[in-house]
């Protein structure tokens, strides 16, 4: 097994994989080495990199909260309940902090991000949202 981070390790310019890197990983994949992408990114943006590889891999996304199989099915998902989300949103509102959460919308439809924008966004939120 070979586990790789995306940003600054496997992917350059956001989604691109260098041809030499792609060829080396394909060689390992063909030799039955499991290639795993491990990232803090959401699955949808990780898919762009997987598509550039040319073969399917395991993907550990959202800092380990979501694990996808090579066939894109979900192996593991750690989610907050609706009650927990409502409690977190109430706390964030009381503190004047905007709340942004990610969900696995792949094959489910809908948005990847759930945003409670009752509070103004800070610059760091804009940066994160634009990058992901």
Name the predicted role of every residue range.
Residues 131-132:
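Anionic-ligand binding region
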